[in-house]
Amino acid sequence: MIVRTLEEIEDTDADIKTENWRSKRIVLAREKVGFSVHETTLYAGTVNDFWYANHIEAVFVFEGEGEITDKATGETHQLKPGSLYLLNNHDKHQVRPKTDMRTVCVFNPPVTGREVHDENGVYPVIVEDEEEAAS
């Protein structure tokens, strides 16, 4: 059994901070459970273009408000506490938080925590090597 708190993750290599968002990676590929879990805050007034070409992502909003736009169709949905969006078709999307928006994100395949969005908003697939996974 693994038990973690967000406080334990703060200011570690699993606490990723950018100008637009902060993501605390709670469960990563090294746990070998087939998914990763992150608590991510997207900052008010930012525009975030993402495309998880190599991952499926589910996002549950538990604080704040914003909107998500499907970049293929132009369809926009309002996001508020209790909203969930599932990017089951590797959808290119844009998230625009009106207020700081706190979310729980689940990725499959799991991320390692070392991924960086490329120019298209894509995470590469990074496979944990066996030696790192054992530590």
From Swiss-Prot:
Record GO terms (molecular function): ectoine synthase activity
EC number: 4.2.1.108
Keyword Membrane assigned: no
Transmembrane annotation, as ranges: none
InterPro entries in UniProt: Ectoine_synth, RmlC-like_jellyroll, RmlC_Cupin_sf
Catalytic activity, reaction form: (2S)-4-acetamido-2-aminobutanoate = L-ectoine + H2O
Domain of life: Bacteria
Keyword Lyase: yes
EC category name: lyase
Keyword list, A-Z: Lyase
Pathway: Amine and polyamine biosynthesis; ectoine biosynthesis; L-ectoine from L-aspartate 4-semialdehyde: step 3/3
Annotated GO biological process: ectoine biosynthetic process
Primary role: Catalyzes the circularization of gamma-N-acetyl-alpha,gamma-diaminobutyric acid (ADABA) to ectoine (1,4,5,6-tetrahydro-2-methyl-4-pyrimidine carboxylic acid), which is an excellent osmoprotectant.
Family in the record: Belongs to the ectoine synthase family.
Record protein name field: L-ectoine synthase
